[in-house]
């Protein structure tokens, strides 16, 4: 994929549905009684992996390209899958489904692609084992493939060493099947889509500060779910509108859940010209249309409790910081090392190759903005967020930027390049 510099970007776009919410809609719909209708489902490879896993366990799921209909079979209605469950590239599928599988009356095996088989799974194996689960790493390296033999579980009070919605959700889902109460406490609040959706399905869930607590219920009830646009996908267009000359972009129906809006806080701190309109709340998930315009930006410090609210947006933020005056420091983001790629090293090396003044640290990076970027050949490492971030950087670099493995955007945003190309230039 070749990207060339543009003179401006203008127009409106509607981004695909939120990936986190789409995953959860399939999972909760499958273990609920009755029908769950999902409007705005993200038809990306990761979410299709979740869909296929539950189909393998006997759940009928219809998808007409607009609406997903999940024919739930209740908390105890899943069937033993024939063969291995393939999660593809999806860490969310791997970790969340493990919490459900840990309590089923059958054994299962989870496998994924090469990236998944390098990502850390001890962070879910530890709390699930504390609950009485039988979960092991087939190769003994605390990574997938995972072998899970369903057991009777008991509730625990778990202090998670990382602020991770995937870890929290895994434990809470297991807690639906456990004897007694299950609580997860995190160092910072992570995204709360599981808590919101579980409550809407009739679960007994309480969230106070950094602790979420679930008690088992007899059943969950299928719902109609309206999936908002994914703020992680919106991030690339927010950055594009802010750094491209003579630009104004409006992104419609973006989810602005307070546990996910870190990039919006950063844009404000950097002095970006941004405004909201049509702010509404549906199914507990607030949305808005967001408009950004070309802005003079200044560097800032990004650290602490905001990091879980923008961890997936940091590659895009790093590009943004290259066009800000002064220094931007990102700290407490060591989680970037265990994403689809080591996003600290990949971003620093690739932006450096484009002429950016950027340095890696143990837990983040330091970007000294203001140096003009030039085109380069960028290896996406088959990481969708890397590919999309450098597409935006390439629009504002001198010369051609070539992204290898650019098709990996299909993981979360299959129409990304079409939407980007559809903006007026």
Predicted regions and their residues:
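Structural preference for solvent-exposed beta-strand-turn elements
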Residues: 1-425
């Amino acid at each position: 994929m070749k990207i060339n510099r543009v003179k401006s970007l203008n127009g409106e776009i509607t981004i695909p549905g939120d990936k986190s919410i789409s995953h959860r809609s399939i999972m909760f719909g499958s273990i609920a009684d009755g029908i769950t209708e999902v409007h705005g489902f993200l038809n990306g490879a990761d979410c299709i992996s979740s869909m296929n896993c539950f189909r393998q366990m006997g759940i009928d799921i219809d998808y007409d390209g607009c609406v997903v209909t999940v024919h739930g079979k209740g908390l105890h209605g899943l069937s033993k899958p024939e063969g291995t469950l393939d999660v593809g590239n999806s860490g969310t599928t791997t970790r969340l489904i493990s919490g459900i599988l840990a309590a089923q009356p059958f054994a299962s095996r989870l496998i994924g692609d090469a990236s998944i088989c390098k990502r850390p799974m001890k962070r879910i194996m530890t709390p699930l084992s504390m609950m009485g689960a039988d979960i092991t790493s087939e190769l003994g390296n605390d990574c997938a493939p995972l072998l899970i033999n369903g057991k009777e579980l008991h509730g625990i009070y778990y202090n998670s060493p990382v602020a991770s919605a995937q870890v929290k959700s895994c434990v809470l889902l297991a807690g639906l099947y456990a004897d007694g109460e299950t609580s997860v406490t995190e160092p910072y609040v992570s995204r709360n889509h599981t808590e919101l959706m579980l409550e809407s399905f009739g679960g007994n869930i309480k969230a106070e500060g950094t602790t979420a607590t679930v008690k088992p219920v007899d059943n969950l009830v299928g719902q109609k779910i309206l999936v908002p646009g994914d703020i992680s996908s919106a991030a690339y267009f927010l950055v594009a509108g802010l750094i491209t000359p003579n630009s104004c972009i409006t992104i419609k129906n973006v989810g602005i859940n307070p546990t996910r809006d870190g990039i919006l806080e950063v844009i404000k701190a950097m002095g970006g010209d941004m405004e909201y309109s049509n702010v509404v709340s549906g199914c507990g998930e607030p949305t808005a249309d967001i408009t950004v315009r070309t802005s003079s930006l200044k560097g800032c410090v990004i650290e602490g409790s905001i990091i879980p609210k923008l961890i997936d947006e940091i590659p895009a933020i790093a590009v943004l910081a290259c066009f800000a005056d002064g220094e931007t420091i990102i700290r407490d983001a060591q989680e970037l090392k265990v994403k689809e790629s080591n996003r600290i090293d990949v971003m620093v090396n690739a932006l450096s190759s484009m002429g950016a003044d950027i340095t890696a640290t143990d837990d983040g990076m330091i970007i000294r903005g203001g140096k003009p970027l030039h085109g380069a050949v960028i290896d996406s490492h088959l990481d969708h967020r890397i590919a999309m971030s450098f597409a935006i950087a390439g629009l504002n670099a001198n010369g051609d930027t070539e992204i290898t493995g650019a098709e990996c955007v299909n993981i979360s945003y299959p129409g990304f390049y079409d939407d980007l190309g559809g903006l007026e230039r």
